[in-house]
């Protein structure tokens, strides 16, 4: 039991840093989904596309 507590105390950074990275990637993906839903509803991007023109925001 003491050895487990010592390991946790010494190596907590090795767990929290990757966990923060994964949570950040998840939040970034959710933010991109919300922005994609809003993409062509704003006045800035709401216009007709020219022939052979790609979407305004990917």
Curated annotation (Swiss-Prot):
Its main location: mitochondrion. The keyword Mitochondrion applies. It comes from the Eukaryota. The chain crosses the membrane at residues 11-27. Pfam families: NADH_oxidored. InterPro entries: NDUB1. Keywords: Electron transport, Membrane, Mitochondrion, Mitochondrion inner membrane, Respiratory chain, Transmembrane, Transmembrane helix, Transport. It is a single-pass membrane protein. Accessory subunit of the mitochondrial membrane respiratory chain NADH dehydrogenase (Complex I) that is believed not to be involved in catalysis. Complex I functions in the transfer of electrons from NADH to the respiratory chain. The immediate electron acceptor for the enzyme is believed to be ubiquinone. Belongs to the complex I NDUFB1 subunit family. This is NADH dehydrogenase [ubiquinone] 1 beta subcomplex subunit 1. The gene is NDUFB1.
